[in-house]
């Protein structure tokens, strides 16, 4: 809404559209603008408020923020990056993945050719670099030249992240009228759900290791809420777009598992595709 947008317009960035990670309620910066996802969500938010209100200023903020994101793509954290340069340089799936989603949200504000180029580059990264045909799955980190890395970070698998990305890709497939892209995203989503599902206790693991080794993250086996929300969205969207029986079955499985762990007085059952 305008009240939230005005607060962020005044206090959310440093004047050059570098967006702080956190603020006090009075608007004073708490955390430096190190996180590129503060920028991506700001761009999406201001783009949508601009569409809703017709504000040229909000549209400009979305556009300027998008430009900053593109400038920072090669080194998103900039001066706040903790990694020592040149030792084990990896690139992350997270940025091209979120740009696939952001592209559709800010489309009205962006030059058509720039938007097309950005979408093309991000689709290539997500579906040809981070997606590994030999695994049938998406990896979280690769070397700067796109190779697998036999390191803790390089072997990290994040099923929820991959499933979230696949419904972004399905949306792009609709926008581009690309049936093959939609079908590929559905195939990857199904592979990922099968891979990430805990066969003993149910639910999708937070992190896994590409080679089956123990993970370093203490929370690797937790069943996080967002993982199951994104997975459910991916499956219902896959079913909607393709009629896939497997997507329908996975939607039901994920939905029932998730609601079995949520304690509310009147649980809601979605029977629309049962």
Task: Describe the function of each predicted region.
Residues 1-16, 61-78, 119-137, 185-200, ...:
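Long, well-ordered core segments of solenoidal/helical folds
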Residues 17, 21, 34, 78, ...:
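Flexible, active-site-adjacent loop/turn segments at secondary-structure boundaries
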Residues 21-28, 81-87, 141-147, 204-213:
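Short linear capping/connector segments at secondary-structure termini
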Residues 68-97, 102, 129-148:
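Short, flexible helix-coil linker/hinge segments at the edges of structured domains or between repeats
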Residues 262-274:
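Single conserved hydrophobic/aromatic residue that forms the stacking wall/gate
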